[in-house]
Amino acid sequence: MRLQLCIFLSFLLKSLSAHNDFYTSIGHMTDLLFTEKDMVTSLKEYIRVEESKLEQVKRWADQLESLSITAIQDPEGFLGHPVNAFKLMKRLNTEWGMLETLVLSDTTEAFISNLTMQRKHFPTEDDQTGAAKALLRLQDTYHLETNTIATGNLPGVTYKSPMTVEDCYELGKIAYSDSDYYHTELWMSQSLQQLDQGEESTIDKVTVLDYLSYAIYQQGELERALEITKRLLSLDSEHQRARGNLKYFEFQMLQQRSDEEEAAQKQRNEGTVGNKTEEKKKGFKEPIPERKMYEKLCRGEGIQMTPRRQSRLFCRYYDNHRNPMYLLSPVKQEDEWDRPYIVRYHDIISHSEIEKVKSLAKPRLRRATVHDPLTGKLTTALYRVSKSAWLTGYDDPLIDKINQRIEDLTGLEMDTAEEMQVANYGVGGQYEPHFDFGRKDEPDAFKELGTGNRVATWLFYMTDVAAGGATVFPDVGAAVWPKKGTAVFWYNLFASGEGDYSTRHAACPVLVGNKWGKSRDIYYYRGYVPEKYPFTLTETTCYCIYFEVSLISNLK
């Protein structure tokens, strides 16, 4: 502030010095009075602007302080709400940058220096965009109303977090940038609704209506686009783009009516009756059947288990054929599905073990990769949104302890195991339908690891998830829901060594909560195979058993 005042006074003195000998002329002196009056007005405006800046900063600081007190009490529970996660990305990437610009000219050099330095470690534009798209993905997968998300009323939430007009507008704008006019319409409409309800915002109705009219037009609804454009012009009659759009939409409407009349006349002349159905364009391609089934199963719909098949599923105490480790204290085993055969082990991992694995993995997390069948290399993919870390028994004896537990329960040896992969799924994180084994068209899928194919999959669940997070099998209509302290297990290969395509599965996005997982590729040469899987391995048979441990927990 002092620097700005010095610059202002310097400019003023230079201006005054251009007119010297004022005392020799009352006329000149009277001019000075008016000059001084203008100076005072300018000075007061400067003070008003600075006070306004400080008031904005103070108000923003108070809001953040209140938010931080709530968030720090349970950081992971707080960020388990996807809106909170999105707003955190938005605050750190956009709003803190706006604050930096606001106070940059002030004398708070220490704050600016610290903020500038810290911003190097802040989320990027890509992070903000990614969080926004995650919200849109959750909205589609779980059929959530826009207002439900905007008001924070998600199922099972502890911390409700309403979205502002700016938040909704930002989602709509990101969708618009992707030519996703369906979601653009949804979120611009929500922004407009909140503005109509009297919410104060830096975003005006004209800007929102401009996006909204174009999004509706792109979906083929000329009449609605025309109505929105007329409303925009009622607020700003000089809006050039809207005036041009109005003429264009009216022309298109006339052309459309003319085409419809010609088509109707042609049908009458040909003596046929046409039945026309209008279908709203959503701005994206119709999902493939697997995608539909995947999303239905994630919502708990479309599960294809009949009562007769259900009656053949049982629970039992299991010791893996009198394994010494479980002879006196067998584990609880439950049949989850028959084809493919999936079993669940109850009370198989403790809370302290979960926390230990998380603490080991957190500093090592990097963006997860998948095998590209075209290049044969590992690469990132949009269908797998997570970060991964790698752990071994050298990092902590617990890793070996968990591996030994799996070996004792499955009878499969893991002496030549690769490192264990730990994955963390972020907001809306998912792993879309995939196979855990290599197909015939991927003979070199695991060549770089020096392994055979993946025989089986093991999953640990670490919390009871309030909403989302299921493991689903679209081809057979199966869904397995997370339950704290349990693990599920299935084989990916038939006895012949051929892949079981019914094991194609997916990790549904977690709607509320955080999801952690760890996987491990292991050579397998010999060992006992359960009776329900009559698959004999010889000393020379080389397969890879794939253990994936899904840790669903709140990161602290």
Segments predicted by a language model, with ranges:
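Fe(II)/2-oxoglutarate oxygenase catalytic core
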Residues: 2-487, 493-556
